[in-house]
UniProtKB/Swiss-Prot annotation:
Protein source organism: Schizosaccharomyces pombe (strain 972 / ATCC 24843)
PANTHER family given in the database record: DNA REPLICATION LICENSING FACTOR MCM FAMILY MEMBER (PTHR11630), DNA REPLICATION LICENSING FACTOR MCM6 (PTHR11630:SF43)
Main enzyme class: hydrolase
InterPro entries registered for this protein in UniProt: MCM (IPR031327), MCM6 (IPR008049), Mcm6_C (IPR041024), MCM_CS (IPR018525), MCM_dom (IPR001208), MCM_lid (IPR041562), MCM_N (IPR027925), MCM_OB (IPR033762)
Listed GO CC annotations: chromatin; cytosol; DNA replication preinitiation complex; MCM complex; MCM core complex; nuclear pre-replicative complex; nuclear replication fork; nucleus
UniProt-annotated binding residues for ATP: G476, D477, P478, S479, T480, S481, K482, S483
Modified-residue entries (Phosphoserine), positions: S96, S98
Transmembrane segments: none
Motif, Arginine finger: chain positions: 608-611
Description of how the protein assembles with itself and partners: Component of the mcm2-7 complex. The complex forms a toroidal hexameric ring with the proposed subunit order mcm2-mcm6-mcm4-mcm7-mcm3-mcm5. The heterodimers of mcm4/mcm6 and mcm3/mcm5 interact with mcm2 and mcm7. Interacts with sld3.
Spans annotated as Disordered: 748-774
EC number(s) per entry: 3.6.4.12
CDD domains: MCM6 (cd17757)
Name of the molecule in the record: DNA replication licensing factor mcm6
Length: 892
């Protein structure tokens, strides 16, 4: 047994403090010099010391022996051989006789899955030998070669064929002393007990095993990195193999041939060199880790081997590895000047010496180094969201993904999930558990729940992707909890981005093309929509965005892609995200006397891309105000005790993750119901009932399908029923807020008023109680706006029908008669018909004044005023009757 195991936990002895037996002085390895022949140490007769040939004195080179490192290697090798996990994934204990060692199983799996990395749980290492664990953490960079040597020895022992296959035949036949590359196999440690932020990294962490967390903002392409180089001397063609590359291109210092003095002329033999995958990612501090008033800091992380392409832009990841100092390429030299070291030959002691100028001459060192992180392990940062690391999941694998998710849960979690699925009224209970700090707004909570569930992504035979994600916009008065919903969703989902519309540009939302400071190449830096891929992008103050910036997200909202053609880069990037937007009405408060389109600063294409619009009004209601005030006061007084939802956040995350594995489909009844509801929406829109929201298009039909699928997922069923379609229809109708209009005053024209005045005069027989002013006043009638629009639409429909038949004008009598026939089902008594005729006459007069219709004058005698029934009316040539009938708006 190694000295490490015999020392146990006695870490108080120096070197030495890890409990290792060592012959070092201090903590430095000893240098053992082998005995030399006396003749080899003698000087030549001429007194000059000649250079010894490298090959001839191979045994005479001083050899450094790190006894502490050897002890670590032996102890780590014993750990890999001896450690056995007491419990398997299912939680059942296995007999020790039938259980194979934990890491020996991993070594056997290397050849099976053709991987090169063994993953070591730091908790296992601590429980087995805490002294060894402490030594590896504090001096990982020093002990890393010894740990890899121990791993290679075990791979050679248990999987000799796979170990030999890692060597190229050329290298194996090149030299009998050729050994396996240290870069071929790798170790990855995880589950370290402590995590650091980017801001905590200092130079004292260099070389120590550390876990850092951050959000990935940029990833480079995977490139080959030279791990072990084989060089050929250009002068004598001697081959030098196994030249380790230490963070830069490293050539041999001198040719080993005793007859060759070459030190610079080398040619790399690519076929006999070993390469490994290399990738650089840039991470940024998480938003909750940035101190007040500070800018977020970034750090470059180097990934090698099997862990490349594990971190995507927008992922919150935990990286385990070591902090290293590398040259800062961007600071090494001035453009056009080759950076090189030279000696200042000026004679400052002479008579012609100039004064000392500049900080460099005063001894200030150049800052030409920066910190980077060399990672050996990449994991999702699920420290705060234990069950919500991938809440949304794409649901593309169906049953297989469902089984895989259930296998990742414990038995207790599975029982709890089963109870939730089989409970009654789960849809409404899930809604009430969302955003418990926000009082009321059940309709908005339903929409957010369905957005988290999402619809089913589809692919047409032509290869066109049909999105399943839902886009929601919340419009309302100030202080109606719009931003609270956005914050809640960002905290609920691990892959959610919060941004503000006023502070966001088009490039910041989509993607930007930036120039890499090291290579000089143009690369794509992800924007908010790319970072929220497979998540939700919450955009607050959406109405404050410039219209040019709103146009930039048209493609992302519908096609869920971002196309870029800049700086020689043509790319189409994925932005499979849902957008949750919040907007304030124009003027601060929602005006119920105008349409939704006129209340918000959005273009029609943007509005049609939102599946749901929720309008929140701050109305005075004594009961609602009392309950709302009590809820807010309880939160300030009792904190978390005031919010007691039925389901916790972890339960909601598990349920949503499980529900997204379902792929519900439409049946015959639900298809017929969707067609029926869509026809009803279009009919209401054509008749003016939907004028207060936006035009109903085919996108609203697709929205109804996506909402129905999301409701089916919320109920964990595979079939969409007509009841789900009706619920989706009712949600879609929520955005159609009734527009309050002032009553319309209609009156008779001057001739009709004069006739009525004469009749009144003859009737009163000179009654002195009626003043002359009242007699001259024209009679006015107030009708509701909806009634006015209904009569106007009926009149215009009759005129347009006659116009298509070739009739230029319609007499008023025929026009009124045709209108009454069109609406005959609305009249029950003769008094209703007489009253309606009077209203139609007054509306005709107003339509003439508003230049919607015009009266055709009598060509024979224009001075003679015809009776009302004989007057001829036609559509005014300046009136756009199609637009007027589509939205129902009339000039004021």
């Amino acid at each position: 047994m190694s000295s490490l195991a015999s020392q146990g936990n006695n870490a108080s002895t120096p070197a030495y403090r890890y409990g290792f037996q060592t012959s070092e002085v201090g903590d430095r390895p000893t240098v053992s010099m082998p005995s030399q022949p006396e003749s080899s140490a003698m000087l030549e007769d001429d007194g000059m010391v000649k250079r010894k040939p490298f090959a001839a004195i191979g045994e005479a080179i001083p050899k450094v022996i790190d006894t502490t490192g050897e002890s670590v290697r032996e102890a780590f090798e014993e750990f890999l051989l001896s450690f056995s996990d007491d419990r398997v994934a299912g939680g059942d204990a296995l007999p020790s006789a039938s259980q194979e060692k934990y890491y020996v199983q991993q070594i056997h799996g290397l050849a099976m899955y053709e991987i090169h990395t063994v993953y070591v749980d730091y908790k296992h290492l601590t429980s087995y030998n805490d002294v060894l664990a402490l030594a590896i953490v504090e001096q990982y960079y020093r002990f890393s070669p010894f740990l890899l040597r121990a791993l290679q020895k075990l791979i050679e022992k248990f999987e000799p064929e796979y170990y030999r296959s890692s060597l190229s035949r050329e290298n194996a036949s090149l030299s009998p002393n050729f050994k396996a590359s240290d870069k071929t196999f790798a170790l990855a440690f995880y589950n370290l007990p402590f995590r650091s932020t980017i801001r905590d990294l200092r130079t004292d962490r260099i070389g120590r095993l550390t876990t850092i967390t951050g959000t990935v903002t940029r990833t480079s392409e995977v490139r080959p990195e030279l791990a072990q180089g084989t060089f050929i001397c250009e002068e004598c063609h001697t081959v030098v193999s196994n030249v380790e590359q230490a963070f830069r291109y490293t050539e041999p210092t001198q040719c080993p041939n005793e007859l060759c003095a070459n030190k610079r002329s080398w040619r790399l033999n690519i076929s006999q060199s070993s390469f490994q995958d290399w990738q650089k990612v840039r991470i940024q501090e998480n938003s909750n880790e940035i101190p007040t008033g500070s800018m977020p800091r970034t750090l470059d992380v180097i990934l090698r081997g099997d862990i490349v392409e594990r971190a995507k832009a927008g992922d919150k990841c935990a990286f385990t590895g070591i902090l290293i100092a590398v040259p800062d390429v961007s600071q090494l030299g001035i453009p056009g000047v080759k950076p090189e070291a030279y000696r200042d030959s000026r004679n400052f002691g002479g008579r012609d010496a100039d004064g000392v100028t500049g900080l460099k001459s005063l001894g200030v060192r150049d800052l030409t180094y920066k910190l980077s992180f060399l990672a050996c392990m990449v994991q999702p940062d699920d420290a705060n969201d234990k069950s919500g690391a991938d809440v949304r999941g794409d649901g593309s694998q169906g049953i297989e993904e469902q089984d895989e998710f259930l296998q990742s849960l414990s038995q207790e979690e599975i029982d709890d999930l089963r109870a939730m699925v089989h409970s009654d009224h789960i849809y409404s209970r899930l809604t009430n558990s969302l955003a418990p700090s926000v009082y009321g707004h059940e309709i908005i909570k339903k929409g957010i729940l369905l957005q988290l569930m999402g619809g089913v992504h589809k692919l047409t035979p032509e290869g066109i992707n049909l999105r399943g994600d839902l886009n929601i916009c919340i419009v309302g008065d100030p202080s109606t909890s719009k931003s609270q919903f956005l914050k809640y969703v960002c905290n609920f989902l691990p892959r959610a981005i919060y941004t503000s519309g006023k502070a966001s540009s088009a490039a910041g939302l989509t993607a930007a093309v930036v120039k890499d400071e090291e290579t000089g190449d143009f690369t794509i830096e992800a924007g908010a929509l790319m970072l929220a891929d497979n998540g939700i992008c919450a955009i607050d103050e959406f109405d404050k965005m410039d219209l040019s910036d709103q146009v930039a997200i048209h493609e992302a909202m519908e096609q869920q892609t971002i196309s870029i053609a800049k700086a020689g880069i043509q790319a189409t990037l994925n932005a499979r995200t849902s957008i949750l937007a919040a907007a304030n009405p124009i003027g601060g408060r929602y005006n119920r006397k105008t349409t939704l389109r006129n209340n918000i600063n959005m273009s029609a294409p943007i509005m049609s891309r939102f599946d749901l619009f929720f309008v929140v009004l701050d109305e005075c209601n004594e009961s609602v105000d009392r309950h709302l005030a009590k809820h807010i006061v309880d939160i300030h007084r009792l904190r978390d005790d005031a919010m007691q939802p039925e389901f916790s956040t972890e339960q909601l995350q598990r349920y949503i993750r499980y529900a997204r594995t379902f792929k519900p489909k439409l049946n015959t009844e639900s298809c017929a119901e969707i067609v029926k509801k869509y026809k009803q929406l279009r009919m209401d829109d054509a008749q003016g009932a939907g004028k207060n929201s936006y035009r109903i298009t085919v996108r609203q039909l697709e929205s109804m399908i996506r909402l129905s699928e999301a409701i089916a997922r919320a109920n964990c069923v595979d079939d969409i029923t007509p009841a789900f379609v009706n619920e989706a229809y009712s949600l879609l109708r929520q955005s159609i807020i009734h527009v309050e209009r002032d009553d319309i005053e209609v009156e008779e024209d001057d001739a009709e008023a004069q006739e009525l005045e004469n009749d009144n005069t003859n009737t009163t027989n000179g009654n002195d109680n009626v003043s002359s002013e009242e007699a001259l006043q024209k009679p006015k009638v107030k009708i509701t706006y909806d009634k006015y629009v209904s009569i106007m639409n009926g009149i215009l429909q009759v005129l347009r029908q006659r116009s298509t038949e070739g009739v230029d004008g319609v007499p008023a009598g025929d026009l009124v008669q045709s209108y009454l026939e069109l609406r005959e089902d609305q009249f029950h008594t003769e008094e209703d018909i007489i009253y309606e005729v009077g209203l139609v006459r007054k509306v005709l007069t107003r339509l003439v004044h508003e230049s919607i219709i015009m009266e055709i004058q009598n060509l024979t005698d224009s001075a003679v005023r015809l009776p009302f029934e004989e007057r001829v009316f036609s559509i005014h040539p300046n009136c756009d009757i199609d637009a007027l009938l589509s939205n129902g708006d009339v000039p004021n």
